[in-house]
From Swiss-Prot:
Catalysed reactions listed for this entry: a ubiquinone + NADH + 5 H(+)(in) = a ubiquinol + NAD(+) + 4 H(+)(out)
Protein's name in the database: NADH-ubiquinone oxidoreductase chain 6
Classification of source organism: Eukaryota, Metazoa, Ecdysozoa, Arthropoda, Hexapoda
Any one GO molecular-function label of the UniProt entry: NADH dehydrogenase (ubiquinone) activity
Principal EC category: translocase
Gene name tied to this protein: mt:ND6
InterPro entries listed in its UniProt record: ComplexI_Subunit6, NADH_UbQ/plastoQ_OxRdtase_su6
Primary localisation category: mitochondrion
Record-stated family: Belongs to the complex I subunit 6 family.
One GO cellular component term noted in the UniProt record for this chain: mitochondrial membrane
Length: 174
């Protein structure tokens, strides 16, 4: 049921994204949609580790874009359209009602308060997560993990050496 709600939120933010004009509002909508996609991918893989890394990488890229947009965009305020707000609220309400109607098994499990089922599901999630992490750090793939760690360390050292701290900003002012 949560996945269905996240699908509806992703669709709603996509519709809102196409109706935005201001670059900062576009960036905020894109960031919110990224949060929803990371939550959905974490729920689907039953481990939030990969979605957390995806979110951090995307957030770093969004911060760079935010710096460029704020330096280039004009200082005009962006207005929220009442029509767009009502439309998005209607879509959210409709998707919520639709997910409640379509997902009758979740409602019956919730009403029956079946705690034993949730404990069994939790145990299967933990074993599945430990197996996926074992595959990542065991023999055939541990070389790839070590290679990626070394690549990131060397990239960090190169970036620090390229940007000289006392020489001023990287971008030349004209």
């Amino acid at each position: 049921m949560i996945q269905l709600m996240l699908y509806s939120l992703i669709i709603t933010t996509s519709i809102i994204f196409f109706n935005m004009i201001h670059p900062l509002a576009l960036g905020l909508t894109l960031l919110i949609q990224t949060i929803f996609v990371c939550l959905l991918s974490g729920l689907m893989t039953k481990s939030f580790w990969y979605s957390y890394i995806l979110f951090l990488i995307f957030l770093g890229g969004m911060l760079v874009l935010f710096i460029y947009v704020t330096s280039l965009a004009s200082n005009e305020m962006f207005n929220l359209s009442i029509k767009l707000t009502l439309f998005s609220m209607f879509i959210l309400f409709f998707m919520f009602i639709l997910s409640m109607i379509l997902d009758k098994t979740s409602i019956t499990l919730f009403l029956m308060n079946n705690e034993m089922q949730s404990i069994i599901e939790m145990n299967s999630y933990f074993t599945e997560n430990s197996l996926s992490l074992n595959k990542l750090y065991n023999f055939p793939t541990n070389f790839v993990t070590i290679l990626l760690m070394n690549y990131l360390l060397i990239t960090l050292i190169v970036v620090v050496k390229i940007t000289k701290l006392f020489k001023g900003p990287i971008r030349m002012m004209s």
